[in-house]
Design a protein with these regions (language model features):
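Sec-dependent bacterial lipoprotein signal peptides
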Residues: 1-17
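Bacterial signal peptide processing site
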Residues: 19-23
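Coil residues (strongly favoring Ser/Thr
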Residues: 32-33, 38-39, 43-44, 132-135, ...
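Short, aromatic-enriched amphipathic alpha-helices that serve as compact interaction elements
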Residues: 59-78, 176-191
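Short, well-ordered alpha-helical segments enriched in acidic and aromatic residues
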Residues: 68-98, 102-103, 192-206
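Surface-exposed, charged secondary-structure patches
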Residues: 88-92, 96-146, 207, 211-261
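Short beta-strand edge/turn micro-motifs at domain boundaries
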Residues: 140-174, 260-281
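Surface-exposed beta-loop interaction hotspot
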Residues: 157-194, 200-211
Length: 281
């Protein structure tokens, strides 16, 4: 990997140029993707589903939670097989009840789109390998607009992952409540977002003219609107393996579903409020 150090103005010009080219490439890619999608035959779709079914039958989806959840969100019959009805549910009012059908469980569209998000307490946690021996993982569906969330708890039982319970609650009951309230406004209010950037924002982006090269440096907060990537908004996810959160730092990883692409947003709390400190793609 080649690293380039640019003076402030040079970096600014290059970033704007890079983004402009990136938008053009993205549009072309989207057009190509649309064409490919439109030309897929029902046979090819069935073939993909058949491959997933074979993976389930051969127990290849239970090696790690990441493997399992990717398949689980795409195969309704697997969801039916691996959901332990009646499913215990704690409501937002604190009442204990049960869910007896898939409709009440809700869909997993928040994990089946173009991307999903995971929050970590540090870069070290993000870079660490997920433990294949994990036996319990929680998946949060976070609604930033209503400031509510539903937690899906998955447990590995007899070697296979199962959805075992649900928990609905408002932000105030979660350890990340302060950050979620901040991020709900950060992702929906451009003025607030601009005010919540570190004075010197560290960026690390891939050079569109050389995929093996990385452009690294700092930009002024005022340049963020020209460079600004699409920040996750609306309904986001958080897969909780065994992260340890503090009130000083949150690392948000935006992962392309099945593409291997990722963006990383690092937020810090300086005692007065949360600020975006760095961004990398």
């Amino acid at each position: 990997m080649i690293r380039k150090t640019w003076v402030f103005m040079a970096l600014a010009v290059l970033i704007v140029a890079s983004c402009t080219k990136g938008h053009t490439d993205t549009q072309e890619t989207m057009q190509d993707s649309t064409w490919v999608t439109d030309t897929l035959t029902s046979d090819s779709v069935a073939e993909v589903e058949e491959e997933m079914d074979e993976a389930v039958e051969e127990n290849r989806v239970d090696g790690s939670f990441d493997d399992f959840i990717f398949t689980f969100t795409r195969l309704p019959h697997l969801q039916a097989q691996r959901t332990d009805f009646p499913l215990p549910l704690i409501t937002a009012e604190g009442e204990e009840t049960t869910v007896s059908n898939r409709h009440e469980v809700g869909d997993f569209g928040f994990l089946g789109g173009d991307y999903y998000t995971v929050l970590y307490g540090s870069m070290r946690e993000l870079e660490a390998e997920h433990d294949s021996a994990d036996s319990l993982v929680k998946v949060d569906r976070v609604d930033l607009e209503s400031q509510s969330m539903r937690t899906y708890t998955f447990e590995r039982l007899n070697g296979k992952w199962h959805l075992t319970r649900l928990h609905d609650r408002m932000f105030g009951e979660d350890i990340l409540s302060d950050f979620y309230r901040f991020y709900a406004q950060f992702s929906s209010d451009s003025t607030f977002q601009a005010q919540s950037l570190a004075p010197q924002l560290h960026v690390s982006i891939h050079d569109t003219e050389d995929e093996l090269s990385v452009i690294e440096g700092t930009i002024d907060a005022s340049q963020w609107t020209s460079f600004c990537p699409e920040v996750p908004s609306g309904i986001i996810s958080n897969i909780r393996y065994n992260q340890h959160y503090t009130r000083q730092s949150i690392v948000m990883q935006k992962c392309g579903m099945g593409t291997g692409l990722q963006e990383v947003f690092v937020f810090h709390h300086d005692g007065t409020g949360w600020h975006l400190k760095s961004y990398e793609d």
